[in-house]
């Protein structure tokens, strides 16, 4: 890491032009291996027959020597494709080498983007906003904004992405031609490139291999989409403050957007007014985005048309307009980040007293509401083999080889994580149903292991099993809200808590 940092500080003006030689440096592969392949949070652990940390440098040196050979990459890829079932160890090491090259290349192409972070002097250090890293920080923002808005657009970022578009996006920031050619080779020739994007699932579902490179490419693509979108949004807000003379300079610019040529100055505001909505809010997580506005339905339709044209003409692919759904907030519930969110209108009657006369005034208060969607969660549990499709708990046979404490700990950890993530739900009944499924599945797994009945295990381990599923979130609630309310299985607490330490979504929520 220190050697990499030293390279960054040597000559920052040359880094964007000389990235390719770094592929022949040993510390790049060591850095990629330590911070990529063995990362337990973002990457799957790599297990290699006969491989340990002591032999890692030997493997790296062997890989670098082979890379100096002519057409090594092409031959290795062809060999991996043709001999997948012949010579397990040979294929495994060849596949591992290709993965090391991919991960190391991802580290290298991230260097120009890392310069933005290390180029700031220490006295101008960017203030840390750790709280904003939490996924839950999005929901207080939605609570504050959505209750005052009228329409929401539910957007799925379109796919498939043409592979050449990904290269062109990076070409604007990386001028190293050999690196770009290598990227094209990795995308077009590797045997798993067609799993870069899986059309059957959301756009953020990538292959388990080469995650670092694919996530980097996807983030670059989304960043480019949002950059153009935010740029036009800022320019449109600026229009209201400019003089008529400035408008004449921007006719051609906005004419390209809407395919309109405006001649008369009096029609500028009529043509461009829908770009100047001050109550437009945009939130995105991975492949799904929410665009909300206080404007009319016509305004949202024009924004939809604009986004479709942007993706079609700027990124050169059909953007599937049906992936943008416009709905009125008062009649619609949208699924976002594992919650089913909506804006409810609560009726309120106020008695008004004026001298001797009194009368009632009926009004309504809009409130942002979030609940746990039961059906998607049960579907995720069924895919993970905790229950059937209908929600009937079943045992987990693959865990019967573990000790009783490990089995209870695993089920309890899953239950606590789900409770922690869904602590912002206003209705806890559905969450208690999920806890019940996990608790009974744990009991069935233990009974299957000891070849006994579920009833006997519930009687013997009832209190212990209940304590494991007594979540940390409920203990926090008991401290914050001292009002004595028992935490029964069918309780109905409505307090919502958003935690600021959740940096990634739960796997069961993300199915």
Swiss-Prot record:
Pfam families named among the record's database cross-references: Intron_maturas2, MatK_N
GO CC terms: chloroplast
GO biological process: mRNA processing; RNA splicing; tRNA processing
Chief localization: plastid
HAMAP family: MatK
InterPro entries referenced in this protein's UniProt entry, alphabetically: Domain_X, Maturase_MatK, Maturase_MatK_N
Protein name per UniProt: Maturase K
UniProt GO MF annotations: RNA binding
Location(s), subcellular: Plastid, Chloroplast
Family recorded in the similarity comment: Belongs to the intron maturase 2 family. MatK subfamily.
Protein purpose: Usually encoded in the trnK tRNA gene intron. Probably assists in splicing its own and other chloroplast group II introns.
Keywords noted in UniProt: Chloroplast, mRNA processing, Plastid, RNA-binding, tRNA processing
């Amino acid at each position: 890491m220190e050697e990499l940092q030293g390279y960054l500080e040597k000559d920052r003006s040359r880094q964007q032009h000389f990235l390719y030689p770094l592929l022949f440096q040993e510390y790049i592969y060591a850095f990629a291996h330590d911070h990529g392949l063995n990362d337990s949070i973002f990457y799957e652990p790599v297990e290699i027959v006969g491989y340990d940390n002591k032999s890692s440098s030997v493997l790296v040196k062997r890989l670098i020597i082979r890379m100096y050979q002519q057409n090594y990459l092409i031959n290795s890829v062809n060999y991996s494709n043709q001999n997948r079932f012949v010579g397990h160890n040979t294929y495994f090491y060849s596949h591992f080498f290709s993965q090391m090259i991919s991960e190391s290349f991802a580290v290298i192409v991230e260097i120009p983007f890392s310069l933005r972070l290390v180029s700031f002097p220490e006295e101008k250090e960017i203030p840390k906003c750790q709280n904003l890293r939490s996924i839950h920080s999005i929901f207080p923002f939605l609570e504050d904004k959505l209750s005052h808005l009228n329409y929401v657009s539910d957007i799925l970022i379109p796919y498939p992405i043409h592979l050449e578009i990904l290269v062109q996006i990076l070409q604007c920031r990386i001028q190293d031609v050999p690196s770009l050619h290598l990227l094209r080779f990795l995308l077009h020739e590797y045997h798993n490139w067609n799993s870069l994007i899986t059309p059957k699932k959301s756009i953020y579902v990538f292959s388990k291999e080469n995650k670092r490179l694919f996530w980097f490419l996807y983030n670059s693509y989304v960043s480019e989409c949002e950059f153009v979108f935010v740029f036009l949004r800022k320019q449109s807000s600026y229009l209201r403050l400019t003089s008529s003379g400035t408008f004449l300079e921007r006719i051609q610019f906005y004419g390209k957007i809407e395919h309109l040529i405006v001649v008369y100055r009096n029609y500028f505001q009529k043509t461009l007014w829908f770009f100047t909505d001050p109550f437009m809010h945009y939130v995105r997580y991975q492949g799904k985005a929410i665009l909300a506005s206080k404007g009319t339905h016509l305004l949202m339709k024009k924004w939809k048309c604009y986004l479709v044209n942007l993706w079609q003409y700027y990124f050169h692919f059909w953007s599937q307009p049906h992936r943008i759904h416009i709905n009125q907030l008062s009649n619609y519930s949208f699924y976002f980040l594992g919650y089913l969110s909506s804006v409810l209108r609560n009726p309120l009657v106020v008695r008004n007293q004026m001298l001797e006369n009194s009368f009632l005034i009926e009004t309504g208060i809009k409130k942002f509401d979030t609940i746990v969607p039961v059906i998607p969660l049960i579907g995720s549990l069924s895919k993970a083999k905790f229950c059937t499709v209908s929600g009937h708990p079943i045992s987990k046979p693959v865990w019967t080889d573990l000790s009783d404490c490990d089995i209870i700990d695993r089920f309890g950890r899953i239950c606590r994580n789900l409770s922690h993530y869904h602590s912002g739900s206003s209705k806890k009944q559905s969450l208690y149903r999920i806890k019940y499924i996990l608790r009974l599945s744990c009991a069935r797994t233990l009974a299957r292991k000891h070849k006994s009945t579920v009833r006997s295990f519930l009687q013997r381990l009832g209190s212990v099993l209940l304590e494991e599923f007594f979540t940390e979130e409920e203990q926090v609630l008991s401290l914050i809200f001292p009002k004595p309310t028992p935490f029964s299985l069918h309780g109905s607490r409505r307090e919502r808590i958003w935690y600021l330490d959740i940096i990634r979504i739960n796997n069961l929520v993300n199915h």
